[in-house]
């Protein structure tokens, strides 16, 4: 499909001119290049109809032709507002709703806010739609608390929306009088309805407030969360940690299949919503805490808390080394990493694999067709050091013991390095093997000088070598 806004430097859909199948192939290849070294990358999950999927829209008010109030989006790398009548990515009901907002605001003679002069009233309009419920929210962002003729505006908006065939569920005003790129202000007042809408996702109902974090592509979110819960291999007996949980969508989706769910989120309003969503859905085995995820899991791990499965869905900058260190201390059997940035995901997988986790699969999901963004669900399991593996041994001599046929010195060194980061010498390996009763050929541990000052294998390295020997079934 063609879009007139592309010629005006919209920048919202950089891949719109590319065939959708080619988009998917390019995104899948990107993930393979970044994550393929960790484990298999599954085929990307795309959409059947990759248009009109955005259930949330933010428009900025400006002055159009003839001084008429209009609204739109910022041009790429600019502060210029491009008027938008409709968008190939936005929910079509929300396109109609925005036209109604503009008409009602014009009727009330509201003026757009001018950042340079500090004059005018209307800054932005945020719209949400519950895809499954059809409920619509209008959030009007103003530069001052007083909305002149607020009741008349509400009446006019409901009338104009009705002309468009849209039933508005709630209207909220939020005040943002600061010089900032942040859209919503701190003060809110409900002008109509209850101040929130409902939507259904993966069998649960969620209350969405103006500030709620909620994935903008409903269809693909169900795919994403379905993959995440499947990757957890839940049996109903597990304690699950949902880190960076937002309003609790992943944790509550998993709650039906787990013994207990604990959600952690730094945004207090999101936690408030998560608790309310749990109550609304009758979920009694989920608890939510307002805390920094890294700090919370660090304290929990130090206190000896354990989790069988950890979901992690961090922001674009990814997780932290401290968080991953605490994951290793909690030693969950499985980790499911939901990522919106494959670059930071690759960085974090490097740390997780060093901590004894194996990447079973990475599955990209096209949450944002026609953009360059990629979501990925990565399934990890804790390596079992007693797991039996097949080793292809290259025998350099025939005179070896039964134990020596299990693994070469090089393989033992590589195992220790990969799982602990430690470098161990053949001398240290020989010393530990001798302690374990494994017969050595004389040249490995025999000193070359008389009265030698023999180096003793440090305790930390001895433990690591013993783990390697156990892994290779040598002790």
Role assignments for model-derived ranges:
Residues 401-414, 425-426, 440:
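Short, charged amphipathic recognition helices of the HTH superfamily
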Residues 148-401, 409-410:
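Rossmann-like S-adenosyl-L-methionine
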């Amino acid at each position: 499909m063609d879009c007139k806004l592309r010629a005006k430097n919209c920048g919202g859909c950089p891949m719109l001119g590319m065939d959708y199948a080619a988009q998917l192939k390019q995104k899948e290849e990107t993930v393979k290049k970044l994550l393929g070294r960790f484990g298999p990358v599954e085929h990307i999950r795309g959409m059947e109809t990759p248009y009109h999927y955005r259930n949330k829209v933010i428009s900025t008010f400006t002055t159009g032709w003839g001084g008429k109030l209009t609204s739109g989006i910022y041009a790429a790398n600019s502060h210029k507002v491009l008027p938008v009548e409709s968008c190939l990515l936005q929910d079509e009901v929300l396109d109609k709703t925005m036209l109604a907002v503009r008409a009602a605001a014009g009727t009330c003679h509201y003026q757009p806010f001018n950042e340079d002069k500090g004059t005018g009233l209307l800054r932005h309009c945020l719209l949400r739609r519950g895809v499954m419920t059809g409920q619509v929210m209008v959030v009007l962002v103003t530069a001052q608390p007083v909305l002149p003729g607020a009741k008349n505006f509400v009446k006019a908006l409901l009338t104009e929306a009705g002309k468009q065939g849209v039933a508005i569920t709630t209207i909220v005003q939020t005040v943002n009088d600061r010089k900032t790129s942040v859209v919503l202000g701190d003060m809110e007042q409900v002008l109509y309805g209850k101040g929130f809408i409902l939507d259904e996702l993966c069998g649960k109902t969620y209350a969405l407030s103006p500030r709620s974090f909620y994935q903008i592509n409903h269809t693909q979110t169900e795919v994403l969360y379905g993959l995440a819960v499947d990757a957890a291999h839940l049996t109903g007996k597990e304690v699950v940690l949902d880190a960076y949980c937002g309003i609790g969508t992943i944790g509550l989706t998993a709650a039906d299949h787990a013994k207990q769910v604990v959600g952690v989120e730094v945004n207090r309003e999101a936690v408030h919503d998560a608790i309310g969503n749990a109550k609304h859905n009758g979920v009694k085995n989920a608890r939510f805490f307002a805390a920094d995820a890294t700090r919370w899991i660090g304290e929990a791990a130090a206190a000896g808390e354990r989790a069988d499965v950890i979901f992690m869905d961090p922001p674009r900058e990814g997780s932290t080394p401290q968080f991953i260190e605490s994951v290793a201390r909690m030693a969950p059997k499985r980790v499911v990493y939901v990522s919106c940035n494959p670059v930071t995901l690759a960085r974090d997988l490097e740390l997780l694999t060093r901590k004894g986790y194996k990447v079973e699969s990475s599955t990209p999901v096209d949450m944002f067709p026609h953009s360059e963004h990629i979501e990925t669900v990565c399934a990890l399991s804790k390596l079992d050091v007693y797991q039996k593996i097949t080793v292809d041994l290259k025998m350099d001599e025939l005179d070896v013991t039964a134990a020596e046929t299990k693994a070469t010195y090089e393989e033992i060194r590589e195992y220790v390095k990969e799982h602990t980061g430690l470098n161990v010498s053949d001398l240290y390996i020989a010393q530990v093997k001798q302690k374990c009763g494994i017969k050595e050929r004389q040249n490995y541990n025999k000193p070359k000088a008389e009265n030698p000052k023999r180096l003793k294998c440090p305790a930390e390295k001895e433990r690591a070598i013993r783990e390697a020997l156990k892994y290779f079934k040598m002790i």
